[in-house]
Amino acid sequence: MSRLSGITPRARDDRSQFQNPRLEIAVPDRTAGLQRTKRTLLVKCVLDETKQTIQHVVTEKNEGTLLDAASIASSIKYHAEFSPAFSPERFELPKAYFATAQSVRDALIVNWNATYDYYEKLNMKQAYYLSMEFLQGRALLNAIGNLELTGEYAEALNKLGHNLENVASKEPDAALGNGGLGRLASCFLDSLATLNYPAWGYGLRYKYGLFKQRITKDGQEEVAEDWLELGNPWEIIRMDVSYPVKFFGKVITGSDGKKHWIGGEDILAVAYDVPIPGYKTRTTISLRLWSTKVPSEDFDLYSFNAGEHTKACEAQANAEKICYILYPGDESIEGKILRLKQQYTLCSASLQDIIARFERRSGEYVKWEEFPEKVAVQMNDTHPTLCIPELIRILIDLKGLSWKEAWNITQRTVAYTNHTVLPEALEKWSYELMEKLLPRHIEIIEMIDEQLINEIVSEYGTSDLDMLEKKLNDMRILENFDIPSSIANLFTKPKETSIVDPSEEVEVSGKVVTESVEVSDKVVTESEKDELEEKDTELEKDEDPVPAPIPPKMVRMANLCVVGGHAVNGVAEIHSDIVKEDVFNDFYQLWPEKFQNKTNGVTPRRWIRFCNPALSNIITKWIGTEDWVLNTEKLAELRKFADNEDLQIEWRAAKRSNKVKVASFLKERTGYSVSPNAMFDIQVKRIHEYKRQLLNILGIVYRYKQMKEMSAREREAKFVPRVCIFGGKAFATYVQAKRIAKFITDVGATINHDPEIGDLLKVIFVPDYNVSAAELLIPASGLSQHISTAGMEASGQSNMKFAMNGCILIGTLDGANVEIRQEVGEENFFLFGAEAHEIAGLRKERAEGKFVPDERFEEVKEFIKRGVFGSNTYDELLGSLEGNEGFGRGDYFLVGKDFPSYIECQEKVDEAYRDQKIWTRMSILNTAGSYKFSSDRTIHEYAKDIWNIQPVVFP
């Protein structure tokens, strides 16, 4: 039974609408099933600070509110009839899901509003997490699990003729994210709510997400993912919460001396709220998503009535498309503008909302100097960077603060999480484009840049001008810009001149010359000068000099993040070291106090407690408590049972039951049958060259090649049966990644139909991999591959999820792999490959032609070129592994270098898997060692070290 507060849902932002202390509303009686007997719902105004009840949903008791299966069934039946989203004739699964979700939402709203009211009353400091992605997954099972109502909802649905698991399967994954960035954000929200921290998330409400992935004979195909087609029962549109967002226009200085941004294109950002419940707590926080439209007065009614319908709707179409797609293609100028509009919409609407809340809570007298004491803004990567100039703009232009005041407030409020060391992912925007789209923000960025220049000059002085110039070139926010005139004179070198008296006689080659000219410290006669000029003229005729290209002026968003915030954190120890020593080394030398590490984590609720109930029950049984779900350090207690035969038997049984489920899932999704007795070897993540799915599939090809050269008896003696599972999306415009996906499916099509190989080796590509697929695959995994080129993966989170579920990792010393290996034990992690500090030297050796490829690597490439996997020769794909340098050449990601150690490490995997006692022991120790990688630990660190917020527990 679950404890809920007794607070009635109501409007959350506009409190002025509550004028009457009592309202009486006639509603259907849900407890009577679908009978339409009327009765009165009593709602007392929250402004009286009196408790309220929803009598038809819950029963009030002294210790809290309890929901049982009967009242839940009545609630579901009520929504099936009175919250119509489907035809009334039948109560089929889609309708059952929608009604069940709305029933759960009723329960969430009770706590949601109570949380909001309590935050308003206490006016404590609150954290705001801004992210372009939130990869939530399905909400139903997670919500009822956090409410501790899983059993009650299962029983209620059984009464109504349905199974909870089947009903939950009808929920589409929310298409609000793509990869680790969005999944981390969602894990953080779960931990924030569970740990009772006052916080909100802010994002965009994408209509079509990134894309829905289909796998055809031609490889990956992208189609729109209309996850909102049947509506979203979890969201509540806040029609009274909208903010204007402006693009283009111009900046003028008014008679009052203030800057005014006028003209241009105006849209409205409208709030959609999604409740995020904590586990075993009443705290329910908000994820506020922005959708975009134009104000109704901007609709061109005249053009519409004149028959120019497209023109009349143009403004609305331009506004709506901002929230159509996550990461729209940006090869075109239009695509770049759309992406920048997305980022600015997120920043502007969110900050306006945060400021409105701060002003409302402050009352009549707003003390802006207290803003950083009430607000912490965390930028999840560089996408929300425009928070910095936008906050300054609002404070100066709209609130009347000085530059000094606005800059001080902004720096104390904003913090930045870096998620990548890849140069292409450290965002840069065209200065020309930004100046056109956001003219006021460019002015502010220029002021920040000039302020930074002055600070650098002040810090390092002018004794070493070469060093100073390099610092400025590397650290400035504005790239490829001239140095401001205020300090340009520091770098002006005096010209060397010599005075020659034309009447003075000079002896040159034994001759006396009276007229001479000075040329580069050598005296040249007039005749020699004429001769040189003739030669220069001839050279000019022979050559058509090509002027050096002028590099484009850019705005470095990552540099702006570092300069404009008070904290910069990496997401794993090795990543944070690279950030300090390489990516932002100049900034680290200037402001070492800004830089921190916050190793990522994942929520143990979704990623083991709910997705792997069989293993969770075993853990609880052997530890003797379920407290590990909130305190994962207790997982370490499993270490003392790692060799216990009874535990090992139960552990293997749980793993096999999960594999049976996955085998059924793969058959349904791909058509391929796999054996649950095989090892499930899984690599699921975004398709990218640095993540090296190519290394994995080349290793599989080598394995297959060996098998084909052996007899059946030799094959079975050397290899353990494996099901190699891939999943992940390649960005639509990332050609090489799409080639890798195509190659994987081609290899699978050949191997999976080879009767000689049978169940000894299968290769499966799971189309449209998402959170729901992960919740099935991860509990069933035996081996998981995290094999990025060392030094290129910031952290990763899937490695943590796999380890938490007793999966053994094979990987490089990269990202969080380093810390996972430390915690689970070196002997329980399969390590291979070059280390991060070796990478630069290895690339240099390759460029110099010193790399000698392993014979086995060359054999694999030749095997592929023979057409074993179809008529495609894969020239472009294999070509990237050949040559010594050049775009798309030279094996930049060191697949060839690491290939020998990789396949040798895979042989060790086979050897370990043969002894199931050893393998199960390793599996148990991986779960035991995963305790550090809970997002609860990460959030505690953010709250203490960056946000300075405290948990707020309901009285």
Swiss-Prot record:
It catalyses: [(1->4)-alpha-D-glucosyl](n) + phosphate = [(1->4)-alpha-D-glucosyl](n-1) + alpha-D-glucose 1-phosphate. The modification N6-(pyridoxal phosphate)lysine is found at K801. Residues 1-43 form a transit peptide. It is found in: Plastid, Chloroplast; Plastid, Amyloplast. Pfam families: Phosphorylase (PF00343). Residues 522-550 are annotated as: Disordered. Coiled coil: none annotated. The keyword Ion transport does not apply. GO terms for cellular component: amyloplast; chloroplast. The keyword Cell cycle does not apply. Its cofactor is pyridoxal 5'-phosphate. It is an enzyme of class 2 (transferase). GO terms for biological process: glycogen catabolic process. Residues 528-545 have a biased composition (Acidic residues). SUPFAM superfamilies: UDP-Glycosyltransferase/glycogen phosphorylase. GO terms for molecular function: glycogen phosphorylase activity; pyridoxal phosphate binding. Its EC number is 2.4.1.1. Keywords: Allosteric enzyme, Amyloplast, Carbohydrate metabolism, Chloroplast, Glycosyltransferase, Plastid, Pyridoxal phosphate, Transferase, Transit peptide. Phosphorylase is an important allosteric enzyme in carbohydrate metabolism. Enzymes from different sources differ in their regulatory mechanisms and in their natural substrates. However, all known phosphorylases share catalytic and structural properties. NCBIfam families: P_ylase. This is Alpha-1,4 glucan phosphorylase L isozyme, chloroplastic/amyloplastic. It comes from Ipomoea batatas.
